[in-house]
């Protein structure tokens, strides 16, 4: 395996959880792995980013309406206008189109076909670790595979995977008896230090991270 000396302590408010999100994203392949048509995939990712940016602008307006007391949250159906509904519909259609162009879990399949097993990763405050067991005669292949995803990351299925991470947070924190209290205690103990925010990220940050922010952080 290998270790990247980057974890939640390297983040800043607004993008907490992004290191853990990368742990997920680097399993999505490269321009040559995990997709049928790379150019189509590039085009779809660009369109998704553009639509998402338009949605963010709309959400800023909704946030102002919430501040003025016209709603309780930016997701309130009463605040959603026809333009936002159309953007969401177009966004969902592109997500489905992207999925049809994917070769699901091809990165893992290549390794498995070569006799490898146990591929996994974890993130903490100071590092992100990727590991796998490979036959001793497949070391060159391992080097090629790992350099492929490090040198040519595509952040494929970014917004879908972001939702997966958000659900992981809910299971790890909100759905456990002491999860929320543990987070509060940790943030108080490490006041003013990056160790004070959770590795998985604050919910408001996870739901707002964009692919452009991810590319800049990488």
Task: Give short role names for the model-derived ranges.
Residues 1-42:
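Active/ligand-binding-proximal structured segments within catalytic/core domains
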Residues 28-217:
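Acidic/histidine-enriched segments that form metal/cofactor-coordinating
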């Amino acid at each position: 395996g290998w270790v990247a000396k980057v974890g939640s302590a390297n983040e800043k408010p607004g993008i907490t959880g992004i290191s853990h999100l990368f742990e997920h994203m680097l399993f999505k392949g490269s321009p040559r792995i995990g997709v049928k048509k790379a150019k189509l995939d590039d085009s779809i990712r660009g369109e998704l980013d553009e639509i998402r940016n338009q949605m963010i602008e709309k959400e800023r307006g909704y946030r102002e309406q919430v501040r003025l007391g016209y709603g309780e949250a930016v997701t309130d159906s009463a605040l959603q206008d026809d333009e936002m509904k159309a953007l969401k519909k177009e966004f969902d259609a592109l997500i489905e189109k992207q999925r049809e162009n994917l070769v699901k879990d091809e990165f893992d399949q290549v390794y498995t076909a070569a006799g490898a097993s146990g591929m996994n990763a974890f993130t903490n405050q100071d590092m992100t670790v990727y590991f796998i067991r490979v036959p001793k005669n497949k070391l060159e292949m391992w080097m090629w595979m790992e350099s492929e995803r490090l040198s040519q990351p595509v952040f494929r299925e970014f917004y879908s995977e972001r939702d997966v991470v958000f659900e992981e947070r809910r299971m790890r924190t909100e759905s456990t008896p002491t999860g929320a209290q543990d987070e509060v205690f940790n943030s108080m103990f490490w006041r003013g230090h990056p160790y004070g925010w959770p590795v998985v990220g604050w919910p408001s940050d996870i739901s707002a991270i964009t692919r452009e922010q991810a590319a800049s952080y990488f």
